[in-house]
Structures are given as C-alpha cells and as structure tokens.
C-alpha cells in the first residue's frame, strides 16, 4: 500500500507540459552541434549518491528493499515514529570505509552524524541523517588515464560521507503517493572538487566510479535504477554555480551539462546575471526548482542519538592491505605480459569477476589460452545462443579438450563439436565418454583410411566444379570450402591438414 502525501499535511499539484516534436528535434540538433566557447570556461563538480549493498538499512533492522510492494519493508524508525532511535549498521560503515580507501581518501579517526532539516513527503523524520561537519573520509582523488579514454587528469575529492536515503514519491493525476521502502537505505555521498574541465572528463569519471563500486561489490553501480544518482554543479567563468539534481543516466548527465553550459553562456553574452540555484533536468532542458540553499537553510545540528564514530589509527592500513585488486591495476596487468590482451577484452573480463577468475584459472594451463578462450570457448557459447556461464564448461574440461587436440586424439573440429554439445545439452560427461558418444575420435592410420580420405575428397571435387574453377583461377582461399565439407562429412575425425594435402594432390594432377 502507498502512504498518501496528505498524511504529511501537504498537497502537491503537478502540471504536465507537453513538448512538441519540432521542439524535441530542435533540442537534439542543438546538442549535436555542441562545442565549447574558448571565451567561456567550463567548470564542474559532482556529488554522487551511492546505495550500499547491505542486508539491512542504515539505522534500523529493516531489510533493504528495491522491488518489494510499497511500504512492506519498514520499521518504526523508518517511518519516523516518535520515540524510536537509530542504531548504526556496521556493514554499511565497512562498505563506506572500503569505498573511501579505494578513492584514495584519508579516513578520519573521528566522524559524527548531523541532522539536515527539511520537510518533504518522502522524509518522515523531518530531517536527513548525514555527515556535514565531520565526514567519514576527506581529501581523496581519482586518476583518469589511458584506460578511461581521456588524457591523464586527477580529480580531487573533498569528502565521503555516510547518510540515509529518502523514500520515493509516486505521481498520480491528482495526488502523490509515498513509498518508504527506500527510506533509511544506506548511502555514501562522494563530493568532488570542481576539477572537471569538460564533459568527457565527467563521463569518464562516472564510468570509472561505477566500475569501482561494482568491482568491490559495494553497490550495483546502476544509474538507471537509482543505485547511483548524480548531482552536477556547473559554472562558467567562475560565476555562481548552478546545481542540476538527480541525473539518472549517462545520457542525462551529458545532455544536461551541454544544455546548462549553453544556457549560462547565452546569459553572459546578453549581460545577464547567473543566479545560484538548483535546477532539474526535464528531458529537453534544465528548469529552476528552487533558489540554492546553504548550510543555514538546512539548520544542521549534531545528532544527539548517535555516538561519535571512533576508528583505530591503523584502520586505513588494514583496509588497504585487505582490499581487492583495483580495476586500473587489473587492466594494467591484463594488457601486459604474459596476457597481452586488447583493452576491450580486458574490460569485458573486469566487468564479470567470475569470468575473469575462469580466464586466469586456465591461463598457463593451456597453450594459446587467449585463442581458446576468446575464439573457441566464447564463440561456441555465442553460436549456441547461450550466455557464458563458468559452470557449463569447467576449466578442467576445457584443459582436457585442448590437451586432446594437442595429442592428436581429436581434431579442432572435433573439439568444437564437443564444446557445442556440452553447451547445448548441459552435459557433465567425461571427455572420453563424449568422444565415444559423439564418435569423433581420430581413426587409426591405415591404407583403408587413406582410400576413404581420397574417395571423400574426389567426390567433393566432382560436386563443386564452381569452387574448383575459382581455385584454378588463383583464389586459394576457396580451398577452405572444400576442406570444410570434408571435415563435416567425417565429423571432424580427420585433421584439416590431411584433407588440405589430399585436395592439393588431386587438384594438381
């Protein structure tokens, strides 16, 4: 069930304005032609709100919930019932500390919580618990580099603070309903300094941040679901900054920044004043939401119900020593000896930790591991229209298949047949059993085998006169067509090189 916003003693009325198709077209064309004016300097900082992957909420024992029916995962504290008190979730604190260390921040030995006062339907307490005065971590940085497709650039961070999320409002024609399942979900807010000099850097930073929190299993990293929400503060020529709230996708971030830069440049060119304010993105432009508040407006006060967080002086070192290998380090390692992967392949592995573990498990156990993994195994899954799963073809099975090919027990075609069979049938049979079942073992050398190979090749030549003619005209690659038919006829039992030798012998007679 939803809680009607009237429960919170105020009523919203929403007016929806429809945008004509011609207006949308003009907007798209304007953004497509976007360019920076050298006389107007772009400056931007970000505030990134990140939902932490915890079992319970930040200050209560309610489970974190994103897809449950409205208002079904709540505690008395989540709905602001008088007399209830917060209790800090240590799992959320640990994830926030891991993120802070990964962002090269200085963990503070003492941090505390404050109340940020404002009244809105999705905030039943009448305030948000955050860390305004003494945040968890300060003075971090993120290094943008070649792995981010932008020139090297250091983005400095002011702080990382732990805070609670709000509920969610759901709009109807004549009312706003409130779902408090999300209320009190643990967040970290990462605040950068205004170091971004162009939108490419902003895009690269957000991508890198998403990858980092996913890789460390701190957050799902999804913008579209609200797991990460971005506020951008943009100014031109050091004029008052404008905040754009709740940008929910990479496309929105880019389009909103382009639009707002153009808007501010136009104001300055017309000798108009830029007002410090908060604006929202409506899909085609930014619109004013409210005059920009400052700390006085929010009446920050320390939260007397939560104790100060005191951390051991060695906590930073301990976390650094136990933190998983960070994405840049993984990419650097995979693109160098002995792996020598292309950056695109390395990125794909990094996005899928289980697949990366599989790849590293077989590397060193298989000659030409890159060829077998990317061009044979993954190709077999793709051709079977099955998503790669590490438990379908075990690492040991792949090693055994490659070994059988190298020992001439089966051909490469036979290996492909086995892989396809395992993937499509989810077979867990042993390799010897599969070779026997599929009848793809290499036949013993004999005069009878030579005669059979000769007969197969001659028959294929006789029925493919057009291909033979192409070969005669110098199209050597056409020979692969004949070899392919021969391999198919023998179910891959005979190696392709034997058919190649026989075809060349017969065609040169």
From Swiss-Prot:
Subcellular localization, as worded in the UniProt entry: Mitochondrion
Cellular component, GO annotation: glutamyl-tRNA(Gln) amidotransferase complex; mitochondrion
InterPro entries found in the cross-reference section: Asn/Gln-tRNA_amidoTrfase_suB/E (IPR017959), Asn/Gln-tRNA_Trfase_suB/E_cat (IPR006075), Asn/Gln_amidotransferase (IPR018027), Asn/Gln_tRNA_amidoTrase-B-like (IPR003789), GatB (IPR004413), GatB_Yqey_C_2 (IPR023168), Gln-tRNA_amidoTrfase_suB_CS (IPR017958), Gln_synth/guanido_kin_cat_dom (IPR014746)
SUPFAM superfamilies cross-referenced by the UniProt entry: GatB/YqeY motif, Glutamine synthetase/guanido kinase
A Gene Ontology biological process term: mitochondrial translation
EC number, as in UniProt: 6.3.5.-
Keywords from the named record: ATP-binding, Ligase, Mitochondrion, Nucleotide-binding, Protein biosynthesis
Reaction catalyzed: L-glutamyl-tRNA(Gln) + L-glutamine + ATP + H2O = L-glutaminyl-tRNA(Gln) + L-glutamate + ADP + phosphate + H(+)
Molecular function, one GO term: glutaminyl-tRNA synthase (glutamine-hydrolyzing) activity
Transmembrane domains' residue ranges: none
Primary residence: mitochondrion
Subunit relationships: Subunit of the heterotrimeric GatFAB amidotransferase (AdT) complex, composed of A, B and F subunits.
More info: This protein may be expected to contain an N-terminal transit peptide but none has been predicted.
Stated family: Belongs to the GatB/GatE family. GatB subfamily.
HAMAP family attached to this UniProt entry: GatB
NCBIfam families tied to this protein: gatB, PRK05477.1-2
Protein name: Glutamyl-tRNA(Gln) amidotransferase subunit B, mitochondrial
Organism: Candida dubliniensis (strain CD36 / ATCC MYA-646 / CBS 7987 / NCPF 3949 / NRRL Y-17841)
């Amino acid at each position: 069930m939803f809680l009607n916003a009237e429960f919170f003693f105020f009523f919203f009325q929403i007016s929806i304005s429809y945008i004509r198709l011609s207006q949308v077209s003009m907007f798209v064309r304007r953004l497509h032609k976007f360019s920076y004016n050298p006389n107007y300097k772009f400056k931007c900082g970000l505030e990134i709100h990140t939902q932490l992957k915890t079992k319970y909420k930040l200050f209560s024992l309610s489970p974190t919930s994103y897809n449950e029916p409205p208002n079904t995962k709540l505690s008395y504290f989540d709905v602001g019932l008088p007399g209830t008190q917060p209790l800090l979730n240590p799992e959320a604190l640990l994830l926030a500390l891991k993120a802070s260390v990964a962002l090269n921040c200085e963990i503070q030995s003492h941090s505390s919580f404050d109340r940020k006062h404002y009244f809105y339907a999705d905030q039943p307490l009448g305030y948000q618990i955050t860390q305004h005065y003494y945040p968890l971590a300060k003075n971090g940085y993120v290094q943008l580099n070649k792995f981010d497709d932008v020139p090297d650039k250091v983005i400095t961070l002011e702080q990382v603070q732990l805070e609670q999320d709000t509920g969610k409002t759901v709009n109807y024609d004549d009312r706003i309903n409130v779902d408090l399942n999300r209320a009190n979900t643990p967040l970290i807010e990462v605040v950068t300094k205004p170091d971004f000099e162009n939108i490419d850097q902003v895009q690269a930073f957000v991508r890198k941040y998403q990858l980092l929190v996913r890789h460390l299993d701190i957050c799902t990293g999804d913008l579209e679901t609200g797991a990460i929400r971005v506020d951008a503060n943009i100014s031109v020529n050091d004029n008052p900054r404008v905040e754009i709230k709740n940008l929910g996708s990479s496309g929105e971030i880019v389009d909103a920044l382009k639009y707002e830069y153009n808007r501010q440049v136009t104001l300055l060119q017309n000798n108009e004043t830029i007002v410090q304010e908060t604006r929202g993105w409506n899909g085609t432009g930014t619109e004013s939401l409210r005059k920009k508040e400052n700390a006085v407006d929010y009446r920050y006060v320390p939260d007397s119900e939560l104790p100060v967080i005191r951390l051991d002086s060695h906590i930073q070192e301990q976390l650094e020593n136990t933190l998983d290998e960070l994405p840049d380090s993984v990419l650097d390692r995979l693109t160098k000896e002995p792996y020598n992967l292309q950056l695109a392949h390395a990125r794909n592995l990094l996005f899928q930790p289980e697949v990366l573990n599989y790849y590293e498990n077989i590397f060193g156990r298989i000659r030409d591991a890159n060829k077998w993994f990317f061009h044979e195994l993954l190709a077999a899954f793709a051709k079977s229209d099955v998503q790669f799963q590490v438990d379908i073809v075990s690492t040991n099975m792949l090693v055994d298949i490659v070994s059988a090919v190298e020992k001439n027990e089966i051909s490469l075609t036979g290996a492909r047949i086995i892989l396809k069979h395992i993937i499509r049938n989810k077979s867990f049979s042993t390799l010897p059993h599969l070779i026997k079942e599929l009848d793809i073992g290499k036949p013993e050398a004999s005069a009878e085998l030579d005669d059979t190979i000769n007969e197969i090749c001659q028959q294929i030549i006789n029925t493919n006169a057009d291909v033979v003619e192409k070969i005669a005209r110098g199209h050597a690659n056409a020979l692969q067509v004949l070899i392919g038919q021969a391999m198919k006829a023998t179910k891959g039992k005979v190696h392709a090189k034997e058919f190649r030798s026989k075809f060349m012998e017969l065609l040169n007679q």
